[in-house]
Amino acid sequence: MSALIHDGVSRLAELDNGILKLQLALDRDNIFKSLMFKGQELILIKPENYASDERPTCGCPVLFPYSGNNQEGLLHLGDECYQSGIHGIAHSLVWEICTFAESSITLSTHATQKTKETYPFDFCLQSKLSLNENGLRYELTAKNESECVMPCDLGLHPFFLNPDLNKTIFTGEFMDGRKLTNEDLDFDRICKSGFLCEQLRVLKCILPNGIQLTFNNLEGFVNTLVWSGDPHRFMVIEPLS
């Protein structure tokens, strides 16, 4: 089932297959307003932040054309420097629906005069999200619509509810077949700047409440950052290019 509604802040595109239910806030960087599995909410939403004009710090923001902070708050492109904030510019964009089916949706957004003040390129971002019985597939692409080379990175920043990071069981597999366990993770770093797992293919997390989350990186996304600003409230699993 699919639907388009409004919650007073943003248009919401909704997909529901009876097991998974997803709501996307099109006017708030296409973030997840909700992701429910068998009636249980998986995603953190901060109502005050969501209802504001500030950069989303909840849901699942898109990271483009970079993640994190640039040195001295400046983006260096050739001989030019541009003021840059955290996690790029996509958080200021409104998304529009391209196709909307029973269990999938494709959306896009484009450069604006405002984004060109800090990132002087024409671009198109497209996201395709589809539900299956027990999973969500998120395909995110960036297209250069400028006449010159457009340097960029791409990523996602999903905030998953987690009552106790220290009681979470992590396992995974790298591209070369090596395995990952809790012993490979630095939980102090996770709670500060984040812990980067390079060349990670799969990451599995068993939460204290018994929910198991499995993340399979799609082609082009070769790194995964694990971070938490509140280890008794949420964790972020960032797929990064």
Could you describe each region identified by the protein language model?
Residues 148-153, 158-220:
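Active-site/ligand-binding surface loops and adjacent short beta/alpha elements
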Residues 212-241:
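Active-site pocket scaffolds in enzymes
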Residues 98-105, 130-135, 162-168, 208, ...:
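A short, structured loop/turn motif at beta-sheet edges
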Residues 15, 26, 109-152, 156-158, ...:
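Acidic, contiguous internal or C-terminal segments within carbohydrate-active enzymes
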Residues 13, 104-105, 136-138, 203:
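Hydrophobic residues embedded in beta-strands of well-ordered beta-sheets
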Residues 21, 74, 81, 104, ...:
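Structural motif
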